[in-house]
Swiss-Prot record:
Alphabetical keyword list: Methyltransferase, S-adenosyl-L-methionine, Transferase
Any GO MF annotation of the entry: methyltransferase activity
Name of the molecule in the record: Putative S-adenosyl-L-methionine-dependent methyltransferase MMAR_0539
Biological function: Exhibits S-adenosyl-L-methionine-dependent methyltransferase activity.
Organism of derivation: Mycobacterium marinum (strain ATCC BAA-535 / M)
Family the UniProt entry places it in: Belongs to the UPF0677 family.
EC numbers on record: 2.1.1.-
Xref: InterPro entries: Ppm1/Ppm2/Tcmp, SAM-dependent_MTases_sf, SAM_mthyl_Trfase_ML2640-like
Key word Methyltransferase present: yes
Binding site for S-adenosyl-L-methionine: 126, 155-156
């Protein structure tokens, strides 16, 4: 279970979820009809090696991401999610935004793989071990950012707004924010603090996009925890539910709407249909998670 002030690197706790997601993006890129192509996700997997690389080579048939149920749908999910947020950033820069803030940046490679207008600055916030890993892997392969990229080594439970300002963020200029795959790892109070921080630093003309997930019913979450603990103890599964804060928060679209933003939430399953990917059936392992997931974007008029 999580504890206040807990820490991690790229292969442990919350950090390892970034590798898991990068592996899914790499598998999506191998499809003949990918929704999004992240050419650098594979580099991260191979840098760590082991099962992270084996699954890309087809040498890990029992890996979760290779399963017909969870694996197939999770890879589709990552392709769709990446496509959604890539399109969000294109709209933001077309509207004139030249400051981008990536919260809990993890192995996000958009600074390296998307086209950015001249004068764009991307601020990436995460724990120092995670930022170091990404920079060293990509730098070791000669990959350079396509615009100015500034690393801010900070825990989002600390005073990240001040750290962002100290790194040159201009609160008087429009900005585009992203919280992708982050909120489920925050307690409710920290999510409120995060949204408040974004709102306080974002001037008129700014944009924000988040992945929002409603909590599971308490009894269902407790059952998932018990099942997962047994599987982890047997060596057959990585922790996931043990990393979550299953706490009730205001839906992101509601929160930002109530604070003067124009927000639109798109249920994940609706977006999957829109981009031509199957929605998990009622008996699927991921059905409950997908049904509670919403992709939201908002502008501050």
């Amino acid at each position: 279970m999580r504890s206040e002030g807990d820490s991690w690197d790229i292969t442990t706790s919350v950090g390892s979820t970034a590798l898991f997601v990068a592996t899914a993006r790499a598998l999506e890129a191998l499809k003949p009809d990918p929704l999004a192509v992240d050419p650098y996700a594979e580099l991260f997997c191979r840098a760590v090696g082991g099962s992270w690389a084996d699954v890309l080579d087809g040498n890990a048939a029992d890996h979760e991401l290779q399963s017909d149920d969870f694996g197939k749908h999770f890879v589709n999910f990552q392709g769709a999610r990446t496509k959604y947020f890539d399109a969000y950033f294109r709209r933001a820069v077309e509207a004139g935004v030249r400051q981008v803030v990536v919260l809990a940046a993890g192995l996000d490679s958009r600074a390296y793989r998307l086209s950015w207008p001249d004068g764009t600055t991307i601020f990436e916030l995460d724990r120092p071990q995670v930022l170091d890993f990404k920079r060293e892997v990509l730098g070791g392969h000669g990959v350079r950012p396509r615009t100015e990229r500034r690393e801010i080594a900070v825990d989002l439970r600390d005073d990240w707004p001040q750290a962002l300002r100290d790194s040159g963020f201009d609160a008087e200029a429009p900005s585009a924010w992203i919280a992708e795959g982050l909120l489920i790892y925050l307690p409710a109070a920290a999510q409120e603090q995060l949204f408040t921080g974004i709102d306080s630093l974002a001037c008129l003309g700014s944009h924000v996009a988040v992945e929002d997930g409603a909590p599971l019913p308490d009894a269902e979450f407790a059952a998932k925890l018990e099942e997962e603990r047994a599987a982890v103890a047997a060596g057959g599964e990585r922790p996931f539910f043990q990393l979550l804060y299953n706490e009730r928060c205001a839906p992101a679209a509601d929160w930002f709407s109530e604070h003067g933003w124009t927000a639109l939430g798109t249920p994940l399953n609706n977006y999957l249909r829109e981009v031509g990917r199957p929605v998990p059936g009622p008996g699927s392992e991921v059905a409950a998670m997908f049904a509670r997931n919403t992709l939201m974007s908002a502008t501050k008029p």
